[in-house]
Amino acid sequence: MCICNCPIRNLEMNKRMLAWMFCLATPLTQAQMLQPGLWELTSSNMKVDGQQLPDMQLMLGQLQNLPPEQRAMMEQMMKKQGVSLGGKGVRACLTQAQVQSDDIPLTDPASGCTQKITARNGKTWNFQFSCPKAQGTGQAQFLSDREFTTKVVGTFNATGQQQNGSMDTRSVWLGPQCGNVAPRT
């Protein structure tokens, strides 16, 4: 299956992949390991069943080129989940209370997703995740209080068929002010 040649199916798959990668790319973190404020998550090296997916910039470009009503609907859905499109990736706001807790709620609380830290070795943490239509393992590397990376491998069912997927994500702190990106509640 070539994801790049089917515009409608590609768009649906890319929307699902954006949601999937956002949920999987944000592991739990320890108290005050990260700065509060606006964060940008950029995914790369995304593969489904061994096939390389288009670059994140291309996927974001496709979403930016949606008809105005579809784009507004997509942006509203993301806003309700506490994220927005911006720059090179997906943006999320973390409050001081969130970074001081042991649980950074970047995934939608209503999504049914859970994450569990399975090993901590300094600034490298391994974790497992489980969502209604995805599960797998990952590793987070905290480079500083303003940057971390994750690598995840798992299975998901975004199209009605079980698929294997993997991706890398880089998360960077953009600053203390979140602007119009509301924090997760």
Residue ranges and their predicted role:
Residues 1-12:
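Short, Lys/Arg-enriched N-terminal segments with co-localized hydrophobic residues
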Residues 27-31:
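Sec/Tat signal peptide C-region and signal peptidase I cleavage site
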